[in-house]
């Protein structure tokens, strides 16, 4: 027996009853970004594998274990993007968008791909909204990005459900000094580390700080801290960021173990976390990556950004019960037509009403059917009103207008008077 066709594991369909919440989130954020002066950029899903190997870093879990990579017909190694920053930096470089110190404030949205174990809030195809800023080196833009996300949580009604965690990773030189000290400390305790942390000792030892294994976290209690190795410039940058967040009353927690999962971060690192989604508690994360553009062959260019997971945010909206009820509003009007002349008139009237009443949700019966069956479909649609057109109505240029959600009587309304009458009824309903 042939296997029935199904979606690939971890790659989910977003069904019609789910998409209103997605559109609400995306629309709310797009409006907020527009108000802050950010411009949308649309990026390819496929990139050369080298882009991510160089940008994210060899030895990271993303590059070593999670990327969807294949050879095309020309033997080129291509990868389905696992994150958006590297592709955005590539586009900025390729098109000269940051040349001459030009400030760029960009945002994007779309699917990302990682071969992970699918679970609630974690998928192999997942969606992100990302923001990237180039050529602004100070803590003021770091603060703007964090405040921007804070405003989004307020608009969505979830501000009390998320907490900002903040850290500074210092300069690359400071991290190198700290890495050496951390490795020396852990080397003496190597056999006590979990297997994953042992592997990271040679690839990305700072990621051990983020281990979820309790025994490893216990070993880290006496470990040296990154803040003891910070350079003065990074300390001043971090203090400037905190001062700006304090000025607007934005509360945060300092988490010295917050290192982010990608190698390109420096100085500011932040995450918004929640305790409402179980293990998948990070809903937004980002930070500064001042060396990434030059790592890709460009001139030294300050960069900072963040990404948020759409699936997790929608799940949090659902968990908190803050999705506006009107997102799933039913149709305003259902048009029933009996006979070909009535069907033609229904089509004409429907288009006139759509022009006269912007935003109206209007359904015209399709597939003919008896009076009884059309009325049944009108009721099932959830529409508030029904229009009825038959031979007599067409001959007299009137419609039957019937409320479906209360006990109101059916009325006969002239075609010319219909837009005004319907608009008044919708305003009262």
UniProtKB/Swiss-Prot annotation:
Keywords linked to the UniProt accession: Aminoacyl-tRNA synthetase, ATP-binding, Cytoplasm, Ligase, Nucleotide-binding, Protein biosynthesis
A GO cellular component annotation in the UniProt record: cytoplasm
Compartment(s): Cytoplasm
One MF term in the entry's GO annotations: ATP binding
Keyword Cytoplasm (UniProt): yes
Listed EC numbers: 6.1.1.21
InterPro entries: aa-tRNA-synth_II, aa-tRNA-synth_II/BPL/LPL, Anticodon-bd, Anticodon-bd_dom_sf, His-tRNA-ligase, HisRS-like_core, HisRS/HisZ, HisRS_anticodon
PROSITE patterns xref list: AA_TRNA_LIGASE_II
A single GO BP: histidyl-tRNA aminoacylation
Pfam families, alphabetized: HGTP_anticodon (PF03129), tRNA-synt_His (PF13393)
Reaction equation(s) it catalyzes: tRNA(His) + L-histidine + ATP = L-histidyl-tRNA(His) + AMP + diphosphate + H(+)
Assembly behavior: Homodimer.
Protein family membership: Belongs to the class-II aminoacyl-tRNA synthetase family.
Protein name: Histidine--tRNA ligase
Origin species: Pseudomonas aeruginosa (strain LESB58)
Gene: hisS
